[in-house]
C-alpha cells in the first residue's frame, strides 16, 4: 500500500513510525514532512494547507490511504477533497472538524446536549466583553473562537489581565479573524487529563490517557506552549473515572455530532478537567494531540493502519484496539527562547532508536549530511517502560545523549504524575 501523511511535525513522525510496522505498507509520503521524518518516509515539499496540490499529488501517486494529521487542513476540508477523488482518509470532514475549528460551536454543542463543561458567555464586541468582566469571577478564561496554534487560550488571574486579553484578541487581532468572536468561561480546578479516542462516528475506542505539560518552565511556570512533554498513562484517570467519561462525555459527544448532521470519523481529542463536581470538557481537538501522540502510539499494541481504516469505513466495532500496560514519557527539546524568539540552524546529533526509546523529529531540516534545528519545538525524546518512574528516567537519559547545543528541556516532566502515584 501507498500511504500519504499530511503534516510535518513530531506527531506526524510518531504516526509514520507506527504505520511502518504494517507489512502491507510499501511506501509512505509525508507532505511536507521534515528532515527527521525523511529517514522514515519520502518527504514532498507541499504545504499541509495546500489542499489542491495535496489532492493532485495523491491522484498522481495513486495513494491507497491518507492520514490528515494537523488541524488546519482538516478544518479547511482536506478529507472532503481527498474523499471526492475516491481516496479513503483518516480524519474528520470539515463539517465535523468544526468541533475544534470553533470554540463557540463546541461550547454551544455541549450546552445543547448536556455534556459537562464550564459555564460560559460568547462575545462579538470587545466593549460588551469588557463590561461583562467587571463582575465576572476571577480568575477567568478567555478563548479565541478559531484556531490559534494552541495559543488562543488565556487564563487571567486579574481583571486587568482579562481586559488586556480581550483587547489583544478582538481589537489588536492577535490571532486574526480567529479572535473576532471570543468565549469567556468559568475557571475550573482539578487535575487535567488528555484522552485521545478513535471513532468511526458511532463506536468510540479511547486510547491510553496522558498528562501534558504546557508551561515553558519547570514547576509549571512561564507562558503556555504547544506542550513541553507528556507522560502516559495519567495516574489521575482511574478506571472509575474512565467509565464516567465514556457515559457522560465520549459517547454523548459522538452522538451529538451525528444528531447535528456532522458525523465525526477519526481521532477525537478530549481535554478534560477532573473537577470536584466530576469530569468536564475543557476543549475538543479534531486530531491527534502533539506531544500526546508521542507517548500514546508507542503503547498501542494493535495495528495502527487497521484501526485507522476501520475508523474511515465505519467498521471500528470489528477491530480490537489494545494498549500495553506499560508507561511512556516524552520530553520535548526546544530551541532556547521558545515560545518567544529563538535561533535556528543549530546542528543536531541524535542517538539511534532502540526497542524502548525513540526520537520524534519536529522542527528540524536536513543541511548537508546532517540535521539542524528549524523550529521552536525540535525533538520529542520518548521512552517506554513497565512503569512510569523508569520511563521518565530513560527519557531523560536519552535526552543526555542528544547533541543540541541550543536546546533546552523542562527537568520535571512527569513530576506531577509521580506525586499522584505516591498518594
Task: Show which residues each predicted segment covers.
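Active-site nucleotide/adenylate-binding loops and adjacent lid/helix of ATP-dependent enzymes
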Residues: 4-5, 100-181, 235, 239-251
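Short, charged, surface-exposed secondary-structure boundary motifs
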Residues: 38-41, 55, 98-104, 217-218
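Internal nucleotide-binding/catalytic subdomain
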Residues: 152, 156-293
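Active-site "cap" helix and flanking loop/linker of ATP-utilizing ligase/carboxylase catalytic domains
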Residues: 246-268, 285-354, 366-367
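ATP-binding N-terminal substructure of ATP-dependent carboxylate-amine bond-forming enzymes
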Residues: 1-94
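Generic C-terminus detector
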Residues: 364-368, 373-423
Amino acid at each position: 500500500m501507498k500511504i500519504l501523511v499530511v503534516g510535518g511535525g513530531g506527531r506526524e513522525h510518531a504516526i509514520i513510525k507506527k504505520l511502518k510496522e504494517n507489512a502491507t505498507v510499501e511506501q509512505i509520503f509525508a507532505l511536507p514532512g521534515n528532515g527527521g521524518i525523511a529517514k522514515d518516509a519520502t518527504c514532498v515539499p507541499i504545504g499541509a494547507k495546500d489542499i489542491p496540490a495535496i489532492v493532485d499529488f495523491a491522484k498522481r501517486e495513486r495513494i491507497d490511504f491518507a492520514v490528515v494529521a494537523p488541524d488546519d487542513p482538516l478544518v479547511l476540508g482536506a478529507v472532503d477533497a481527498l474523499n471526492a477523488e475516491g481516496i479513503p482518509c483518516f480524519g474528520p470532514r470539515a463539517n465535523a472538524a468544526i468541533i475544534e475549528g470553533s470554540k463557540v460551536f463546541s461550547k454551544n454543542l455541549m450546552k445543547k446536549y448536556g455534556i459537562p463543561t464550564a459555564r460560559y458567555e460568547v462575545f462579538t464586541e470587545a466593549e460588551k466583553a469588557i463590561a461583562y468582566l467587571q463582575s465576572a469571577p476571577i480568575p477567568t478564561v478567555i478563548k479565541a473562537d478559531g484556531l490559534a496554534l494552541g495559543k488562543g487560550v488565556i487564563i487571567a488571574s486579574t481583571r486587568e489581565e482579562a481586559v488586556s486579553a480581550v483587547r489583544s484578541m478582538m481589537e489588536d487581532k492577535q490571532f486574526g479573524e480567529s479572535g473576532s468572536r471570543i468565549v469567556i468561561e468559568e475557571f475550573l480546578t482539578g487535575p487535567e487529563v488528555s484522552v485521545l479516542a478513535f471513532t468511526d462516528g458511532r463506536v468510540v475506542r479511547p486510547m491510553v490517557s496522558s498528562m501534558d505539560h504546557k508551561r515553558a518552565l519547570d514547576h509549571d511556570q512561564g507562558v503556555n506552549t504547544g506542550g513541553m512533554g507528556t507522560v502516559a498513562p495519567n495516574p489521575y484517570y482511574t478506571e472509575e473515572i474512565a467509565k464516567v467519561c465514556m457515559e457522560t462525555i465520549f459517547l454523548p459527544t459522538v452522538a451529538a455530532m451525528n444528531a447535528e448532521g456532522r458525523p465525526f470519523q477519526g481521532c477525537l481529542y478530549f481535554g478534560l478537567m477532573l473537577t470536584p463536581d466530576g469530569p468536564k470538557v475543557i476543549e475538543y481537538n479534531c486530531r491527534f494531540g502533539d506531544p500526546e501522540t508521542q507517548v500514546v502510539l508507542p503503547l498501542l499494541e494493535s495495528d495502527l493502519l487497521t484501526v485507522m481504516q476501520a475508523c474511515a469505513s465505519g467498521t471500528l466495532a470489528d477491530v480490537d484496539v489494545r494498549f500495553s500496560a506499560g508507561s511512556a514519557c516524552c520530553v520535548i527539546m526546544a530551541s532556547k527562547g521558545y515560545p518567544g524568539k529563538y535561533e535556528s540552524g543549530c546542528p543536531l546529533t541524535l542517538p539511534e532508536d532502540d526497542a524502548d526509546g525513540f526520537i520524534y523529529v519536529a522542527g528540524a531540516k536536513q543541511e548537508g549530511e546532517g540535521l539542524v534545528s528549524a523550529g521552536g519545538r525540535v525533538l520529542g525524546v520518548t521512552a517506554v517502560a513497565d512503569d512510569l518512574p523508569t520511563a521518565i528516567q530513560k527519557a531523560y537519559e536519552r535526552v543526555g545523549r542528544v547533541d543540541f547545543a541550543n536546546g533546552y528541556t523542562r527537568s520535571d516532566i512527569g513530576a506531577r504524575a509521580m506525586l499522584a502515584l505516591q498518594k
